[in-house]
Amino acid sequence: MKNRIILCLGCLLAFLQLRAQVNTNQQHLCNPNSFSIVLLGDPQNYVKYDYNQPVFELMTAWTAHHIDSLRVKAVLCTGDLVDQNECILPPFPRFGNLTSREQWTFVSRAFGRLDNKVPYLISTGNHDYGYTRSENSMTRFPEYFPIERNSQWKKTIVAATNNRNGLPTLENAAMEITDEHWGRILIIAVEFAPRDEVLSWARELVATPRFKDHTVILITHSYLTGFDSRRITKEGYKITPSNTGEGIWQKLVQPSANIRLVLCGHYATPNERLDYTTGFRTDKNAAGHDVHQMMFNCQALGG
């Protein structure tokens, strides 16, 4: 009898332990035939302080955990992976407490949770170039994000063009995903303040016979403001040649019949108001189709 009681208690404990390991907070799709694309806003303020880094680590960990339950086909990031691209000391305490190498190492490790599981594209930001904010074309991005690091890219990256230093990198790249209901989707990421030749490359790419019937998503770092959702027309960065949000619209988005969504980050005001860290507008392209344009940069809200 005593042995039976011990056996029953053992089975009960094993059952309770199994129940405790079930994740009751895992998210699921309302429509099992749908899919997800995850958008990560600018990471820079999570990355530049060691005590903020767990916030971004949680974002990529959560995404990796939900790849199957949310049918995540791609992850996109609006850029500014670091706050200073090339500094051995932060310029001022409010600009962080880590060197540039420590920032790049961390953000690379955080994205490592997604490697070989899901393809992702990053639109490099102004802080990813120069020393602190695009004083020149120097960037550590290709060093930390070579195409070889994620096996999913071999299946999905379909085009790329050279960066400002004449190197073929993922700063300007296109990724193709498919869905039985949506059909074929082309996602294009372009460098911060893209040059005319990059916009021409993207415009010609979406018009080719291979991609002209795809639904195209463009992700770029700087494009819309928050609050009133204006396309940006002027910025004070030294990096040249360049285009602002309005230039991207006029030279790439508006003339292209199949670009239907533009995503960006960059703009934020640290005043705890969501409407200052997000933006949205819809305009017609040359073919008369709606183009939805969204800015998302919630780092100023603390998460």
Which residues does each predicted region cover?
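His/acidic metal-ligating clusters that form di-metal
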Residues: 64-74, 116, 164-176, 181-280
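Stable alpha-helical elements in mature extracytoplasmic
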Residues: 52-63, 78, 103-110, 137-141, ...
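Active-site glycine-centered loops adjacent to acidic/histidine catalytic or metal-binding residues
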Residues: 42, 79-80, 125-126, 221, ...
